[in-house]
Amino acid sequence: MASKPDDDGFLAPYVSRSDAQRPLSIVSSRMTDIASEDGDGPEVQNNRLSIPQSTDMGSRPDTARTGASSSRGPWQSQSLRNKTYLAGVQAKRGSVESSTAGSTSQPPSLSSRSHVPSLQSHAFFRPMSSQKLQAQRGGSHRPSTMSQMSAAASPSSPTSPTSPTSPRSDEHGESSSSQMRQSIISNPIAQLQRQMSNEENMRPPPSRGTEMTEQETLDRITANTSPSHGHYPAGSLTDSVRPLQGMSSDTGHFQHSIIVDKSYKDLSNLPSPIKTPRSFRSSFLMPGRSNDGQLSQNRSTEGAEKLSSAASSPQFRPVDSHNEQQHPRVPYKPSQKSDLGRVHQYFDGNTVFCLGGRWQNTRGRPINIATGIFVVVPCALFFGFEAPWLWNNVSPAIPIVFAYLAYICFSSFIHASVTDPGILPRNLHQFPPVDDDDDPLQLSPPTTDWALIKSAESTTAAMEVPVKHCRTCNIWRPPRAHHCRLCDNCIETHDHHCVWLNNCVGKRNYRYFFTFVTSATVLAAYLIATSLTQILLYRNRQGISFGQAVDHFRVPFALVFLGFITFLYPAALMGYHIFLMARGETTREYMNSHKFAKKERFRAFSQASVFKNFIVVLCRPRQPTYYQFKAHYHEGDQRLGIRRDKRPRSSSQGLEMHDVNPGSSGFQGPVSLRNDTPH
């Protein structure tokens, strides 16, 4: 049946009348679910009822647009479609029940099963989600397919109400077959299952509104080498689609239903995954055994952090309500591991810790103890021999000020000596290990690079500073960071290693170091002033000579010389670091700059202002440590090494104290012959 083309319809496709089986159309399975909502007149409905129903699957009926255009003009159909579209938009703004009711009001027609439906359908403007589509299918009567219409028109069962292909109605007037898809032939997967299985109880084809419409999912379904009616895609359905694949207890057929009960615990419909040719083995990426029977690793795990994981998921089994009562579930309690110690016990640097990792110092000669003695002894002599006389004869403010300066000096000394100067974490940028088969003449990876630093000076916009890779710490050091050979650590913004503190001076303790040097200088000058004041006041009040006054106050006179000695070195350090801070440089940067000519010396980190340089150094926030030495150790931390008490101890004796095995005797030429020759 053909229709002439007009402005409002499409040409009817050419229909082959041969008996040869045509290939399946996947497009039809996607497009036939969209019901046409054009307003059809009475004459169009009569034309639909008068269409002969043929059982030939190779033929294809005319589309609704072609049939409608042959019976009515373009202007009439255009006005009817506009009215229908306005009515459809109002119905779309309602709930799902409104759309369901609208779909059940029209009888089954060929327009709802055409390959080219109405272009003004609701589905093109407001497509449904997979959940709403499943709900609509479960509650509405789906239109019959061509196979059902052919079976209904066949003379074998013209009046059979219980035909296998005819829908069965319950007492509420709803079709029970709407929960199962009737269009088996429109889906190629279902047809394949129908051809390979003769049973009627077969799983319904996957929904068109779910992820099964994707091509890659279709490939996963057909990947099994031995498909059967019980085959299902292993692990390809999402959790929102799995509850839809259920079996009805009344009919014994698979049906689509939405289970919204939160207490759903029946796992009988969730079988275990089936192994396919594309499945990975259970020991994938796990260390296996080599030919000699020893464990071998397919990748290096050195420096890797071991993450905790839960046990493997067991296979799903049917859960019975009686079994749940007999065997109640026990809440899972993670196993508590024994205390592995603190972080500082696994640290690889040349650092000694005390007070649980709160204090740290370089493992070497404790010269800082002598520095502390030089601070404590003069202060103790002052409070023992000068403070009482000054408190009673001059003013109590003098001993109080001295006590405050002594507190600042000693406190800053402790902080600068036992504080983390800014130790950078280790083993963050490890180079790949060198194999024995590698070419020894091959160039190694570069260990130097350049970093671009924005300059605050108006003459230059940016400057490049060198950065290096530390082979000892296995990290790329940031700008201004250096490795200290005494501490055996990379220090951030490293200034120098102070032997008087027995610790490095870096970004985290530079402020304490400068405070200690400055307060020690001021304290030494204050000690000299108070000692001389006490001697001179006693001489004037007693009317005696200076020698007699010194003979009366011998300790204050000794403190004058001690204060002068302790004043020189701290004063020099204080002036030097004031000069460095004003320039925006560190001690290491200033020393290295003298390797170049004056024209090539640049200060990349200067703020172009003396005041700003002081603010940046002295008023910057003190960042936390990278290691947290007081924290508990977690197994697999790549920054740390072996625990100190479990490390192999190196012998303190030299090589000459051990027995040296003689080398293998071989041909040594004339020397051996000359030694054996008798003289």
Swiss-Prot record:
GO terms for cellular component: endoplasmic reticulum membrane; Golgi apparatus. Residues 103-114, 143-167 have a biased composition (Low complexity). Residues 1-181, 194-250, 267-338, 640-679 are annotated as: Disordered. This is Palmitoyltransferase ERF2. It catalyses: L-cysteinyl-[protein] + hexadecanoyl-CoA = S-hexadecanoyl-L-cysteinyl-[protein] + CoA. InterPro entries: Palmitoyltrfase_DHHC (IPR001594), PFA4/ZDH16/20/ERF2-like (IPR039859). The chain crosses the membrane at residues 369-389, 394-414, 512-532, 555-575. It is found in: Endoplasmic reticulum membrane. Residues 44-57, 66-82, 291-301 have a biased composition (Polar residues). GO terms for biological process: protein targeting to membrane. Keywords: Acyltransferase, Endoplasmic reticulum, Lipoprotein, Membrane, Palmitate, Transferase, Transmembrane, Transmembrane helix. Belongs to the DHHC palmitoyltransferase family. ERF2/ZDHHC9 subfamily. Its EC number is 2.3.1.225. GO terms for molecular function: protein-cysteine S-palmitoyltransferase activity. The active site is at 498 (s-palmitoyl cysteine intermediate). Residues 390-393, 533-554 are lumenal. It comes from Gibberella zeae (strain ATCC MYA-4620 / CBS 123657 / FGSC 9075 / NRRL 31084 / PH-1). The DHHC domain is required for palmitoyltransferase activity.
